[in-house]
Amino acid sequence: MEEPGGLHESAEDLFHFNVGGWHFSVPRSKLAQFPDSLLWKEASALTSSENQRLFIDRDGSTFRHVHYYLYTSKLSFSSCAELNLLYEQALGLQLMPLLQTLDNLKEGRHHLRVRPADIPVAERASLNYWRTWKCISKPSDFPIKSPAFTGLHDKAPLGLMDTPLLDTEEEVHYCFLPLDLVAKYPSLVTEDNLLWLAETVALIECECSEFRFIVNFLRSHKILLPDNFSNIDVLEAEVEILEIPELTEAVRLYRMNMGGCSRTSCPPLSPGKGGRTASVESVKPLYLMALGLLVKYPDSALGQLRIESTLDGSRLYITGNGALFQHVRNWLGTCRLPLTETISEVYELCAFLDKRDITYEPMKVALKTHLEPRTLLPVDVLSEEWTAEVTIYSPQQIIKLYVGSHWYATTLQTLMKYPELLSNTQRVYWIAYGQTLLIHGDGQMFRHILNFLRLGKLFLPSEFKEWPLFCQEVEEYHIPALSEALAQCEAYKSWTQEKESENEEAFPIRKLHVVTEGTGPMAEFSRDAKETTACMPVDFQECSDRTPWNKAKGNLTRSSQMEEAEQYTRTIQVSLCRNAKRGGNPSTYSHCSGLCANPRHWGGHSESPPKKKCTTINLTQKPDAKDPPVTPMQKLISLVREWDMVNCKQWEFQPLPASRSSSVEEASLHVPSGSEAAPQPGTSAAWKAHSITSEKDAGPQTGPGAGVKDKGPEPTFKPYFPTKRAITLKDWGKQRPKDRESPAPEQPLPNANGTDNPGAILKVAHPPVVGNDGSCMFFEDSIIYTTQMDNIKHTSLTASPQLREVTFLSFSLSWEEMFYAQKCHRFLTDIILDSIRQKDPKAITAKVVSLAYRLWTLNISPKQFVVDLLAIAGFKDDRHTQERLYSWVELTLPFARKYGRCVDLLIQRGLSRSVSYSVLGKYLHEG
């Protein structure tokens, strides 16, 4: 056999694998020795032009032993601690020789010998370490010096740990901290240890691996240390530096109880006793931390700085095009540094920069450029840099998870098997929606929880020693199936029995609190028992029979869209033996409500745009309707805040019964009675003088429901569906494969009266659509005013095969831009529908339709549109109203036009679930 040290392979002869965030390279010659394995089948299928890394959604730490076996055909001694998990991986990857070796080991016919060459390089360091490697946009060419090389786990973001953030090749500890925790304990972040800052998270450098126990205490107020913990001196030294009184007291109590249970609780200090955390050191503004971070790097690393802001100008962000920001974007999905959260902080930022020296000059220039008076671009001019784009996020989308002192990679499908995780807004924050996720927990313990999410079964090391901490973590994730799996774990039962002699005071977590499933909102995530997932757990004992191995099949699913940093990555979906049964709670990935886990900013600030109500699960607090608008933008839209499709509830598009016929049906819009319409927030047309009286007027009000008994002609919407029936996202996963793959025959759209087309209103149901700024808010339907019916008429109405693999979509607009775009569309459609519903004379309705058409086609300016609209009889017309409405239309119309183009593209690509339309010309010609 060739000596390990003599192995040298060129980059062209290497296959690259990303296993749960661990990066491995295997020579072609070694992998070819296992021709029946899934690894060889998929890697060898790559063409020479495909320089990709195959992604496997499995535990990377365990794959080290698989990797070592691929090189040496031997097992390392260290693999004994996790044989069950190693067995599961070998079975899923169809590595039959490794399975035979594990069987022999189990039966005592194979003995492991401890030799220096058997110890993988990565195992010599704690799992809390990482080593610096260059972050590039293609697979790294790792120097393979011996078969002992078992892969590089990018536990810290490679881009962050490379120049310019850390110009070192030494091993460094790091930790991801939610900003809420930093605000509570400011001493955690200093100028020296801050590595990066985002809207929801701060990344800091730590002095020791024991720092994770400190963060765990600050979250739970409990000292949870491993059995026989020996590094108490190191931990105590770190605690003294932080000067957090309750933490210091908890560690002191633990040292007093050395030899007892490793669980010490400390009640939270009462107000006024927070020591440094409350009185000595106050919370620093974000701009102090962000600017202090940037000035540590040369201008060449920053590139050209620029300031971005929300539309109301209250929140400022700084970004650049230098190497620093490029590295951060590759790993976190966003590189915007938050500067301010309120209007008042903008003034404070200006005053702060005025007092700074030349070091802050690039920041000063960027801020001055941003604050210079600018005029809005004409509505007929769209940015040359902007193009309509619709990005698809499939269940195989790779998600990076940052958990305390570790990071992992998995797929969106895995996270959605148990949607309780993403619904847990106390523990989960999206850094960049659909790309990177911050989980507020212990990184080392989350490895076992993630394996449960993948496999539906707990796989713990044979000598697991952190039971108190693991129990605490399981309880706080609120996943019933996980709690039940721990309660049934034999190792856990044995451990609790060993602790029976200890009193309840010293050992309060002797029994695990199991969260049971009820009939609450989460019940709707349950999956049809007939449908199974691709990743199923396998018991070690159940797989001793060779028969299922020969039947094991694997398939590769290519992700249709990958994040920028993973363009070279494909996803291997491991399918295990057919007889394996999934334990726990089966669930479907096809429901998207759990994806609404919100960053902290979108709920707690009145400057944020109002939220769209989630149609399935409410994860955010409703804004208080009584609070007055506090920002210029909110004051501006207060006039039209009720123009959120006045008839949105009344002119409801009725769902059609599932019909097997392909005929085009018409659905009349339902108009509720006045009593039904009254409570709805959007039913008072503030811009119609004859529809509403002043809020201060105590007299009777005539709401939009007036005259319902004697209705005039109402709009009808002709729906056509890309598939046989209207399908919701929740129902999509429950369909049989035949239902998904059989589109309905194409239905022609009617002629829109040629050039005499005054426009149409579309109602498009589609997968959840998010912005391109990482926000977690989304829309699942769009009401669009359009004059481009010809584009839709010539579009194939058959469902795209991609639709089956769509979890959500992203438009090339920010969430805020999409929000105001929808407001503008609903305003235009509302004034038309309200005129029809109010039985206005045909001349008035025609005038309103004509004005909307001329505005949309840019044949009239926004100012002239407002003047002509308010001049129509029945509208309130005063100078104040004109100015506010003109400003609002001028602001939102460009966003609406961009949003309309994105929706058109969505329909053309066959990504809509259903489309209903109403051609407005018919109402102008009816007698």
From Swiss-Prot:
Disruption phenotype: Males are infertile and spermatocytes fail to complete meiosis and show defects in metaphase I organization. Keywords: Activator, Meiosis, Nucleus, Phosphoprotein, Repeat, Transcription, Transcription regulation. Detected in adult testis. Residues 664-760 are annotated as: Disordered. The modification Phosphoserine is found at S270. InterPro entries: SKP1/BTB/POZ_sf (IPR011333), T1-type_BTB (IPR003131). Gene3D superfamilies: Potassium Channel Kv1.1, Chain A (3.30.710.10). One of its GO terms (biological process) is protein homooligomerization. Residues 731-743 have a biased composition (Basic and acidic residues). It is found in: Nucleus. The keyword Transcription applies. Residues 18-72, 399-486 form the BTB domain. Its main location: nucleus. One of its GO terms (cellular component) is nucleus. CDD domains: BTB1_POZ_KCTD19 (cd18373), BTB2_POZ_KCTD19 (cd18374). Transcription regulator which is essential for male fertility and for the completion of meiotic prophase in spermatocytes. Regulates progression of the pachytene stage of meiotic prophase and promotes the transcriptional activation activity ZNF541. Required for the organization of chromosomes during metaphase I. Identified in a complex with ZNF541, HDAC1 and HSPA2. Identified in a complex with ZNF541 and HDAC1. Identified in a complex with HDAC1, HDAC2, DNTTIP1 and ZNF541. This is BTB/POZ domain-containing protein KCTD19. It comes from Mus musculus.
